[in-house]
Amino acid sequence: MKRFIYIIAILSLASCSFLEEDPQGKLTTEGFFTNASDLDASLNSLYSVVATSQQQNNFVGTDFLHGDDISTHPASNKQSLREFDQYTVADNNAWMQTLWEQRFKVIKAANFIINNASRTPDVAQEDIDAAIAQAHYWRAFEYFYLVTTWGPVPVMLSEVIDYNAPLVSEEKIYELIISDLKTAEAGCPVTYSKAPYFQNGVNVAVSQAAVKATMAYVYMCMAGWPLNKTEYYEKAADKAWEVIQGTMDGTYYYELLTAFSDIHSMAHNRNNKELLLGIYYNRDRHPNAIPATDYLLEMAGGWGDTQGEIKFWKEFPEGPRKTATYFPKLMLNGTLQDWWYDTDPASREVVAPIFMKTVESDVRGAEYDYTSGKACPSNGEKTVQVIRFSQVLCWYAEAVGRSGKVTAEAVDALNRVRNRADGAVTDMYSTAMSPEELAEAAYNEHGWEVAGYYWSGFATRARDMFRMYRYKEHFEYRVANPLIEVAPGVFRKEAVPVTGSWNDSRMYAPYPYTDSAVNPSM
């Protein structure tokens, strides 16, 4: 326990800005990594820092609001969120600052292991390699977040802070990400053999399959904007297929859960075999602040941070997936209403569909009942779902299509996802599709699979739109903000106004002022 506290102290020294550390306060790593307990403590600490970085939405980010699936409140205390929803982010955006600093806290924790763990004595080399591999994964994960949110950023590969670190280009950062992921792929086990890395029949720590899946999506992003190196689509397809084939030959245990409603259920919260990578929480020891964030202020206990965009909801195919994604009805003033309900004259500030993936019951372990009218707890323990197997199936199909091909395997992968979404074997996709049709179908299916779910900050709908350079199209749609018929004779539109004209600077967030004021390169 003392070792764990000591390493937490080392890794928590970063101030509000990662560039504002006092160099006189730098601690030496000498005296650590002297035995197996130190190695375990360093990993436990890394995962604690990772969990903290995802435990509330001002840590995990706000760039997800660029997506066409999700919006925010037009007033209240949501200015930091609205700026992202409107593509007009200021460099003093308070939430962006925490988003930025959390990424570098994880990077610092990962660097601590990468640069020091190899000297641990009396530990099997396999265990050392696995620890270092996991650290490389999380460093890659955070640099992926940084490069897709800010573009060129400083690169820190040690615990020493360089106050004059130059900005590194997107291409070079992607090279670092792939290098880190290749190290992780070589060192992360297929299945862990002991707790806490393996619990309830699933990997809790980063596994080989999770790394391969991550590489597949990173390659897809490298094939898209801004690098536009389309040859990477074939690499993405190959890497996604390695995961899929591994589930077919028994190398990996991952599978699609039978019903979409199972995915975010409490029954599968800690033993979800569709989940390639999750971040786990406990209400008593390390809770998250997720349950109340994403439903309306006027619902019991809601924080009203996000709601669904109307056009996306309208185009979302009906079926069990849609039913499990959005509240079927909203409890408003003690009465269940359709989301488009309003008083006469109109009085509701936000009239929009509401996502239901992150809510939790006030009774621990019970499934949430949207008809009860009871508030969600402020402290939650739903697992943050970083990558699911259904996403890998979509990525495979899209990457095959964007490579100019249509294969039976890609079509089958996409039908597996859609059949579950429909709750029946519809097999709506076929090899008669063109490559472009296959790619767009997979892109859409992935969007519907992850709609409104931004907690890992990895392959969100916004990230898909970023790599396909579709922010501009959505920005112009939001400027127009047309009325949409959501029920016979009932028309609604977005509550948050978007104005101005497009330029590509809106693709990225500005660097936080607190850091750009310190580093002249920013």
Language-model features and meaning:
Residues R3, L13-S37, A140, I177, ...:
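Bacterial Sec-dependent N-terminal signal peptides
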Residues S37, L43, Y47, T52-Q54, ...:
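Elongated scaffold/linker segments in the mid-to-C-terminal portions of large proteins
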Residues D40-Q54, S76-W150, Y163-E175, L181-P196, ...:
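Conserved, well-structured interaction surfaces
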Residues C16-H66, Q97, F112, V518-M522:
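Acidic, glycine-rich segments characteristic of secretory precursors and extracytoplasmic regions
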Residues V147-T149, P154, Y192, C221-N228, ...:
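Short coil/turn linking the two alpha-helices of tandem helical-hairpin repeats
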Residues E30, Q56-P74, P189-A209, M220-E298, ...:
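Short, surface-exposed recognition loops and adjoining beta-strand edges that mediate ligand/DNA contacts
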